[in-house]
Amino acid sequence: MEYRNFKVTDVFIVETGANIPQNELESGKTPRISVTNLNNGISGYYNDLSSNNYRVQENFISFSFLGTCFYHPYKASLDMKVHSLKPIGYMLNKYTALFLVNLFKKSFNGVYNDQISSTDLKKSYIRLPVTNDMIDFDFMEKYIKNIEAKMQKLILYHSVLAIRERERERE
């Protein structure tokens, strides 16, 4: 597979979250994505607000200034210093998103003294698979599905081994 470098902003719509004071957030159902590397970046669940600073995205990759990166197929609001990334002209699915999340994690691991500004992210390049000079999202999807299938076989294999081991212990 051939790979080529692409400027992040040539491939993704990059938007940022904004600070909402904690006292303005009320417990609710919409996940709030922060810079944490725990729980898929979710810091809590809150009611939607009608404020220009309240930014909501759906079906996107979150990328924080600390380099945390997750896929969110659901509607979520973004905290300050969290970016949303959506491919231009392509709708993410779980497989392509997982491929891209891992690429972003590898590409930005330890870069910029572990802090990545909006400016740095937008000027950055990411190496993506291409076919006929076009980004190959189909390859990304098949690649992750192949890994998933191999993992299922391994899980089945280990389950069979565990059953056989228990049977031997009973004898």
Regions found by a protein language model. Give the residues of each.
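DNA target-recognition domains and sequence-specific DNA-contacting regions of bacterial/archaeal
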Residues: 10-125
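IQ-motif-like calmodulin-binding regions
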Residues: 128
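Non-catalytic DNA-recognition/assembly elements of restriction-modification systems
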Residues: 1-19, 24-40, 131-171
